[in-house]
Amino acid sequence: MKQEVFSGAVKLPYLTNYLVSNKIHRVLLVTGNNSYNKSSAESTLEPHLESFEVTQYSEFSHNPKIEDVIRGVHIFTRKRCEGIIAVGGGSVLDMAKLIKAYQVSPGDISSEVKENIVGSCDTKLIALPTTAGSGSEATQFAVVYIDQKKFSVSDEKLRPDLVFLISNFTHSTSAY
């Protein structure tokens, strides 16, 4: 899979074109509880998403738990989302990857995570990191906790399809 990477907010109009050209009308927007607003991502992205049906999912722990993933998958399915946009740090991007990985899962998601099983997931994933350093926007890995035990899911299909690196989004993050 070829990943497209753009730098700077000036490239954001491509986001709208990308969604339209991929026939994505309903989007699951995965964000941090506060970072989406504090980073200026919300005000920057809003004009580019106003012609789409957007469902925001931000009610999950900083270290994603399997229950959070299952809830996210249910929201994605119930709202009939066609694409995922992740705006946040490593945990947010991991959550979006996991929702992508298991949104078509017919089985027990916990068992599939433990066995590193990722089914067919052709849903487009767009990443806009608000932190520098996790590198999650460039990798095929995602971390989730099941019963306080850490599991890593790895599959090439989890690498975001499109990435926007916007330096202003990182200005509100802590130095640590």
Where are these regions (language model features)?
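Conserved strand-to-helix beginnings and helix N-cap segments that scaffold or border functional pockets
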Residues: 39-42, 69, 96, 137-138, ...
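Structural motif
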Residues: 4, 26-28, 55, 82-85, ...
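Generic secondary-structure signature for well-ordered alpha-helical cores
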Residues: 20, 24, 50, 74-78, ...
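ATP/NTP phosphate-donor binding region
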Residues: 1-83
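Short Gly/Thr/Asp-enriched flexible loops that form oxyanion-binding sites at enzyme active sites
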Residues: 44-45, 73, 92-106, 138-141
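Glycine/serine-rich anion-binding loops at beta->alpha junctions
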Residues: 81-99, 130-136
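A glycine/threonine-rich phosphate-anchoring loop and its flanking beta-alpha core
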Residues: 104-176
